[in-house]
């Protein structure tokens, strides 16, 4: 058993660590609230872009937009959004396990895989995989938002260009979904083709409305250019929204991880204090025994 001085030193060390984790919990909570506001602000834009694409597509049903129609899948692409920093529990590893399962299924079906990674954790993880081809990387830095946005936009454009050129036939995005402060879960959604924005009922209704002249648009450019640009903006907005949502997940997970660390530190301190009291009790008992032995000898 350690002596009393060593135990006191350990208690002080754990208390210092507890102060750090407590401060990190407060910082993460503050950042999480800001991230949630940003996440909620971008959603109306994505929803509006979705509605516009529906209306424009319905008004031009004769144009076979390449972003809206499915095709035979020979190669797929993934945009994986992770964090740049750690200390956020199992947030990243749970996401990687989820997307890796899908990637392995594609590889078993002899479907090629290209990956665009956003975040250093995803970059480090997928760089170790032999059967996965990383075609683009990007990072999001709060201190250089404009530079980060340009880098992410460039990485996403690489995947869009590969889809347009027919090098990949389907594009997915893997990120974390913010359910609540204490719950975040991995999510895999299809970015391209974006035909999923229409249900069968909507397609039928849109065709009827278009036939009746319900929407009558006048375009400054060709409908092809307008619709293609809208689809690209829609995809970019989805990725942007996913990055902001993933940031909220990161701060929520870090807040909970630091809270658990702070609580565990309290338990460790209590146990160390118990050990300290046992050591002191043993020392006092030994001293009393020595005193009694000395008195008996006299």
From Swiss-Prot:
Cellular localisation: Cell inner membrane
The name this protein goes by in its record: ATP synthase gamma chain
Function comment: Produces ATP from ADP in the presence of a proton gradient across the membrane. The gamma chain is believed to be important in regulating ATPase activity and the flow of protons through the CF(0) complex.
Gene responsible for this protein: atpG
InterPro entries: ATP_synth_F1_ATPase_gsu, ATP_synth_F1_gsu, ATP_synth_F1_gsu_CS
The keyword Manganese is assigned to this record: no
Major place of residence: membrane
SUPFAM superfamilies per record: ATP synthase (F1-ATPase), gamma subunit
Assembly behavior: F-type ATPases have 2 components, CF(1) - the catalytic core - and CF(0) - the membrane proton channel. CF(1) has five subunits: alpha(3), beta(3), gamma(1), delta(1), epsilon(1). CF(0) has three main subunits: a, b and c.
GO molecular function: ATP binding; proton-transporting ATP synthase activity, rotational mechanism
Family: Belongs to the ATPase gamma chain family.
Signal peptide: none
């Amino acid at each position: 058993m350690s002596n009393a001085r060593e135990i006191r030193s350990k208690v002080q060390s754990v208390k210092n660590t507890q102060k750090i984790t407590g401060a990190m919990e407060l910082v993460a909570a503050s950042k999480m609230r800001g991230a949630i506001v940003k996440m909620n602000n971008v959603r109306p834009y994505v929803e509006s872009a979705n509605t516009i694409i529906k209306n424009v597509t319905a008004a031009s049903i004769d144009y076979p937009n390449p972003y809206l129609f499915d095709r035979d899948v020979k190669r797929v692409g993934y945009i994986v959004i992770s964090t740049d920093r750690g200390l956020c529990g199992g947030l990243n590893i749970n996401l990687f396990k989820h997307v890796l399962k899908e990637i392995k299924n594609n590889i078993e079906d002899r479907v090629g895989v290209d990956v665009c990674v956003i975040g250093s954790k995803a970059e480090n993880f997928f760089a170790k995989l032999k059967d996965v081809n990383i075609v683009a990387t990007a990072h999001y830095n709060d201190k250089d938002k404009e530079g980060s946005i340009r880098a992410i936009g460039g990485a996403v454009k690489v995947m869009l260009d590969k889809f347009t050129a027919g090098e990949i036939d389907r594009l997915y995005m893997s990120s974390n979904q913010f359910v609540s402060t204490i719950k975040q879960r991995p999510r895999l959604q299809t970015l391209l083709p974006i035909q999923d924005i229409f249900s069968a009922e909507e397609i039928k209704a849109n065709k009827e409305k278009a036939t009746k002249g319900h929407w009558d648009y006048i375009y400054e450019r060709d409908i092809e250019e307008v619709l293609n640009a809208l689809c690209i903006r829609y995809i970019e907005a989805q990725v942007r929204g996913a990055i902001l949502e993933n940031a909220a997940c990161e701060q929520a997970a870090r807040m909970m991880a630091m809270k658990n660390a702070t609580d565990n530190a309290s338990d460790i301190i209590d146990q160390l204090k118990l050990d300290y009291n046992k050591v002191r009790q043993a020392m006092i008992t030994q001293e009393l025994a020595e005193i009694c032995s000395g008195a008996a000898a006299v």
